[in-house]
């Protein structure tokens, strides 16, 4: 799973042509949506093949109501089911539809390339400053929790911790949600099987900590961290090779221009390690504008072909 999901140009042209041959957008709105299931729902079906997604168009809400059926992680014969509205990949319950602007979509174009500060324009810099402003982050839309709460049974701390398991990972152990136990074990096995060249030898021999489950929110936001679901891991090497590893720590040292930190001055795992994580459905935080180079999250929906 390597490429970004995005609507094709042909698809947009088809939409334009469809509406251009109809006299009223109001007359065509419901029939069009009734027969055209959003591409994003198909992305989730591919990303989570063991989960059922049954979409039905709700004329009153003018949106797709998706029945999601999940097998219990501990007892596959037991099923959990919930109806959530698609709402541009926010997966909201009916009583949250009037608050949809408070949530951001779960699907976005994940970048595989680290943004190079040498290419930033003045406009880019202004946007970065606004995005990372503490007040803006506190008051910005949050990640909707409803889909993940259903899939991982992690509505609260007690329910989450019923599913946390400890597994060997690389040269250490880590606590994660049991649903990602197998993909993470495959990651570990593939990495340990890589040829021990100088880069890999240094990477494995200097690995001092791997952090998984931790109950917390994302820094400066109201969104739950993926660590609090047991779906994220941090890989920390000894002394970070004397490099920078996390945007917020750098911002404390250089509050006025932290975003201009050269890529060469940031620690990063070997590219082959990042690639193995991607193969198993994990995104790397090093390509975010708010780069978190130690961080990996399980998001197979962002990596679907």
Residue ranges and their predicted role:
Residues 28-35, 39-58, 62-84, 217-305:
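Catalytic cores and adjacent binding grooves of peptidoglycan-active enzymes
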Residues 3, 138-139, 223-226:
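A general structural signal for short secondary-structure junctions and capping/turn motifs
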Residues 45-46, 50-136:
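Solvent-exposed N-terminal domain segments of exported/luminal and surface proteins
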Residues 2-11:
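Bacterial N-terminal signal peptides that target proteins for export
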Residues 199-216:
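Acidic, glycine-rich low-complexity/disordered segments
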Residues 12-18:
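Hydrophobic helical h-region of N-terminal Sec-dependent signal peptides
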Residues 135-203:
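Active-site acidic/histidine clusters and adjacent loop/turn architecture
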Residues 20-22:
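N-terminal signal peptide c-region/cleavage motif recognized by signal peptidases
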